[in-house]
Amino acid sequence: MNSPHIFEELDFQKTPLGEISLRKRTEPRLDNLLIYEVKLGDDFLMSSLFVEAEEQLSELALKRLKLNGHSHELNVVVGGLGLGYTALTALNDMAVARRRTIDVMQPVISWHQQGLLPVGDVLASDARSELIHGDFFEIAIDQSEGILEQQKVHAILLDIDHSPSHWLNQENSSFYNLESLRRMKRKIVDGGVFGLWSNERPDPEFTKLLDQVFSHTEEHIVSFANPYSGGESINSVYIATV
């Protein structure tokens, strides 16, 4: 017997960036697989059907940290909560002692705290986890030597904008330059990493920018099956070492 078709809007809120909504639905083209989606206005921001690159952001950053000699009691900050897969993947590594996620949209944080999303219970209840309502970009590039409580961290992972040149909010563009990246770098320990997810292929110009700030930069292409196109989609992950 086929599973029943589901389409439900779980929440709808107004935010400074526009109207944001969370919905869950079954996908009849995928045997009624249950998926969760977030829309901002008329734009689809994210889907639980495509989370491979978000997970790889954490996995690749933690792998590089360990190669750099940081293998326990890791302190990780994630910019952008979304559906929570970058944050959850960090928590799945027991070398991570503390993982704080900053998101400018309170409704997104509330979805996890209320258990509306599959990973929300873990993110809201794990003692190593903290969800913070705030502007990641303001926090990351202020004049202090640390981040949140003036403390340097092992990794800062960013999953907010579509790419370094395609921003969720025009104001975010001021982060992707030498001065801002250098300010953020001061908040990361030696041998620590900055990781960035992008919905696009690696951008050589952004890699050059990272090379001017960090000691080592990696570009990773993450490909995954796209059942809608019948082919593969490609995201990318940048990992830069302090």
Where in this protein do the model-derived segments appear?
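Rossmann-like AdoMet
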Residues: 1-64, 92
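Histidine- and/or cysteine-centered catalytic micro-motif in compact active-site loops
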Residues: 43, 161, 199
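Class I S-adenosyl-L-methionine
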Residues: 14, 200-242
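Loop/helix-junction capping segments adjacent to catalytic residues or to phosphate/diphosphate-binding pockets
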Residues: 47, 84, 204
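Conserved beta-strand signature within the Rossmann-like core of class I S-adenosyl-L-methionine
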Residues: 191-198
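The AdoMet/dcAdoMet-binding core of the Class I SAM-like
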Residues: 51-187, 217-223, 229-231
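A broad, low-specificity signal marking well-ordered, structured residues that form hydrophobic/aromatic
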Residues: 20, 36, 129, 237-238
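A short, structural micro-pattern
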Residues: 16, 32, 103, 231-234
